[in-house]
C-alpha cells in the first residue's frame, strides 16, 4: 500500500533511505495535472515537456520523470491484462466452436454408419422383379385388313330406294334396288318359291310318257325331266342373269318375265 502511494505521489525509492526527511508528497491537484498530461501523450516524456511540467507544478524534474515512469509501467501492465482477457475469451470461444464441430462430426459419422448399414441391407435383399412390359398390339397386314373389311361389308338403304355397299377402301358404291332385290331372291329364296302360286300348263296325251306311242317314237323319254323342275331351273338362271345385267338397264320383274 505504501509503495502504491509513493508511486502515485512520485516518491523516489532510491532516495527514501538516505533522505527520508526530504520526501515531498504530491498534492491531488498535481496528480490530476500529471494524469491529464499522461493521457495526452503516453510516449516517453521529452526533456522539454518534463521541465515545463516541473516548473508549472512547482516540483523537481526528477520527481516528474519518476512519476511518468511508474505510471507508464502500470498502464502497460493494465494493457497486458486486457489483452490477456481478450485472448482468453477468444480461446474459450474457439474451444466452444471446436466442441460444437466435434459434436457435429460425431453426429454425421453416426448418420453415415446408419446409412451404410441400410445400403448394405438393401443390397442383400432380393431386388423386386420389374413390372412386365405392356404388350403392344401388332397391326394386321394390309391384305388381311382388306379381306376383313370386304367380309364385313354391309348394305345401307337410303330414302330413295338405292343401296350403298361398303368396299374394302371405305368408300360406298350405289346399287339399284332391282339388283339388290334380285340378288336377295336368288340367294335367300329357294327355286320352288318362285312358283308357289303358279299353275302348270296343260299337257296333251302325246306329251305323256304313258301315251299310245311306242318307244321308238320317244327315244329320249327316259331322260326327260318333269315340267316343273325344268321351269324352276330356267327361273334360277334368269335370276342370276338379271343380277349381272342390273347395272346396264333396269330388268323386268322375274315374275313378269316368266309369264310374258
Swiss-Prot record:
Domain of life where this protein originates: Eukaryota
Positions of region (Disordered): 1-24, 121-145, 190-221
Biased composition (Acidic residues): 1-10, 205-218
Disulfide bridge partners, by residue number: none
Keywords in alphabetical order: DNA-binding, Homeobox, Nucleus, Transcription, Transcription regulation
GO molecular-function terms, A-Z: DNA-binding transcription factor activity, RNA polymerase II-specific; sequence-specific DNA binding
Example of a GO biological process term: positive regulation of DNA-templated transcription
Gene Ontology, cellular component aspect: nucleus
Tagged with keyword Magnesium: no
InterPro entries hit by this protein: HD, HDZip_class_I_plant, Homeobox_CS, Homeodomain-like_sf, HTH_motif, Leu_zip_homeo
DNA-binding span(s): 19-79
Positions of region (Leucine-zipper): 78-122
Function comment: Probable transcription factor.
Family: Belongs to the HD-ZIP homeobox family. Class I subfamily.
Protein's name in the database: Homeobox-leucine zipper protein HOX25
Organism of this sequence: Oryza sativa subsp. indica
